[in-house]
């Protein structure tokens, strides 16, 4: 087996036994990236010199007996995470020359434990998109079919896992941006509960919705990564100060008596037949493992997408006001006066999807429309939260599709924003409710594209999700399938 094929826990065992070195594993990954990038475009920036230096430092730690499970493991992160001294663009022209002076807490935690940064991953511009087509660095492609999108906005994070270009990756999830790409690329993607992982140093899209999470090849790796990322951060007032469980200890495979809800609103007319078939197979697998199913209702699901796109764009309008060309990022030349410089810098620096969302958010917050749009959307969000609270009174987990269809072709929906937005119809409610959810490989379409199912847990119920996901993984082979590169 090639070194780039190993999971995190498999590579750790070989590093610990000194069967391989971190430098060897890192070199194998860098060679893989160089080989496949012309076809996949998963990376915006590759950092070979930094990676090899960090790998050699990790090997010294391992030799000194100071290593843990993450030391020497090759990692790549979405280009939304600040990485001190390394270009961070957020997929946008407006940040095409931005070198941050500090690092995101989530990345810094992994760096301190000896992980090796391979580079920064492609994404939709400012995490605004469901297909990775809005990136200023060009679209990322799905390793299972390079004519198809990998999902978004963390498309590069999922594609790099599927293409074996990184052992693990980091992404962010505002309305499904970890789970939808994970489903389309056949990997595991977890959106933790809001506040479980620090957002400090992550470029903000919608601050009340954004959350950091891992994308991995299997559930064990996901549990390891979540344990490393979770915890209170005094630099992030929205991070929650509560103990971090031993997530690996939750992987018991015993789910007898687990109560799983099936929300009737998610099994809609128009659901792709292959997605429905994968859901049916997943339900049958869980029944064999001893889980009990109950039909539930999440009655305000139909209003989730509209509510989300008012709240998220309103927050984006405020968050992106800081990009004006003055202190950092793209600055327009030949502007006559300050206001024209602001206008030209933003017009040249932002792409069309970002401009669309800024305009929508500004409109929703404007005088005379605030009550009708933004305030009403927040009221709907409260109702969606209440739906989940009520549903979880009778079940332990909720099982749903991740996306209505498998990955679609590049360019298919780029001129139809509404159809693009509906790609996240099953993932958005989780962000509005602030709870946790995972995408888990569960099938292959007739066209050979991966299909995931979504496990939704109670707030801070990641242990239950991981237990159920691991049991499913051990009973199936979907996670072990490889993209035909």
Curated annotation (Swiss-Prot):
Its EC number is 6.3.5.7. The keyword NADP does not apply. It catalyses: L-glutamyl-tRNA(Gln) + L-glutamine + ATP + H2O = L-glutaminyl-tRNA(Gln) + L-glutamate + ADP + phosphate + H(+). This is Glutamyl-tRNA(Gln) amidotransferase subunit A. Transmembrane segments: none annotated. Allows the formation of correctly charged Gln-tRNA(Gln) through the transamidation of misacylated Glu-tRNA(Gln) in organisms which lack glutaminyl-tRNA synthetase. The reaction takes place in the presence of glutamine and ATP through an activated gamma-phospho-Glu-tRNA(Gln). One of its GO terms (cellular component) is glutamyl-tRNA(Gln) amidotransferase complex. It comes from Pelobacter propionicus (strain DSM 2379 / NBRC 103807 / OttBd1). Heterotrimer of A, B and C subunits. GO terms for molecular function: ATP binding; glutaminyl-tRNA synthase (glutamine-hydrolyzing) activity. Pfam families: Amidase. The lineage of its organism: Bacteria, Pseudomonadati, Thermodesulfobacteriota, Desulfuromonadia, Desulfuromonadales. Gene3D superfamilies: Amidase signature (AS) domain (3.90.1300.10).
């Amino acid at each position: 087996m090639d070194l780039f094929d190993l999971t995190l826990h498999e590579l750790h065992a070989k590093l610990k036994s000194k069967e391989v070195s971190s430098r060897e594993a890192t070199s194998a990954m860098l060679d893989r990236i160089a080989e496949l990038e012309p076809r996949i475009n998963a990376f915006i920036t590759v950092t070979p010199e930094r990676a090899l230096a960090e790998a050699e430092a990790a090997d010294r730690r391992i030799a000194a007996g100071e290593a843990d499970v993450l030391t020497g493991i090759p990692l790549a992160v979405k280009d939304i995470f600040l990485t001190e001294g390394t270009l961070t663009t957020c997929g946008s022209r407006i940040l095409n020359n931005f070198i941050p002076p500090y690092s995101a807490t989530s990345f810094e935690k992994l760096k301190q434990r000896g992980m090796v940064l391979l580079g920064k991953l492609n994404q939709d511009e400012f995490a605004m998109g469901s297909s990775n087509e809005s990136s200023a660095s060009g679209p990322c492609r799905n390793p299972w079919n390079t004519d198809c999108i990998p999902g978004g906005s963390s498309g590069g994070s999922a594609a790099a896992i599927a293409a074996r270009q990184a052992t693990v990756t980091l992404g962010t999830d505002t309305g499904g941006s970890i789970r939808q790409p994970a489903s389309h690329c056949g990997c595991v993607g977890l959106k933790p509960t809001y506040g479980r992982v620090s957002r400090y140093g992550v470029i903000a899209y919608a601050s009340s919705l954004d959350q950091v999470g891992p994308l991995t090849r299997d559930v064990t790796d996901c549990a390891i990564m979540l344990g490393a990322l979770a915890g209170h951060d005094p630099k992030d007032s929205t991070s929650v100060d509560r103990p971090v469980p031993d997530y690996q200890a939750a992987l018991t495979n015993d789910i007898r008596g687990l109560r799983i809800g099936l929300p009737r609103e998610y099994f809609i007319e128009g659901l792709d037949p292959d997605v429905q078939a994968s859901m049916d197979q997943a339900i049958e697998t869980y029944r064999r493992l001893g889980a009990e199913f109950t039909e539930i209702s999440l009655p305000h699901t139909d209003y989730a997408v509209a509510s989300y796109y008012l709240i998220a764009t309103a927050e984006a309008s405020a968050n992106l006001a800081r990009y004006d060309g003055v202190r950092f990022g793209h600055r327009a030349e030949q502007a006559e006066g300050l206001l024209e410089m602001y206008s030209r810098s933003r017009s040249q620096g932002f792409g069309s999807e970002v401009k669309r969302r800024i305009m929508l958010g500004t409109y929703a917050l404007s005088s005379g429309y605030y009550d009708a749009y933004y305030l009403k959307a927040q009221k709907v969000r409260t109702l969606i939260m209440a739906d989940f609270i009520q549903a979880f009174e009778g079940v332990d987990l909720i099982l749903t599709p991740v996306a209505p269809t498998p990955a679609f072709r590049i360019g298919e929906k780029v001129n139809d924003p509404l159809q693009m937005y509906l790609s996240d119809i099953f993932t958005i409610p989780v962000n509005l409710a602030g709870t946790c959810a995972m995408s888990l490989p569960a099938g292959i379409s007739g066209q050979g594209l991966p299909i995931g199912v979504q496990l939704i847990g109670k707030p801070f119920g990641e242990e239950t999700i991981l237990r159920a996901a691991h049991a499913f993984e051990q009973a199936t082979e979907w996670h072990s399938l490889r993209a035909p590169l």
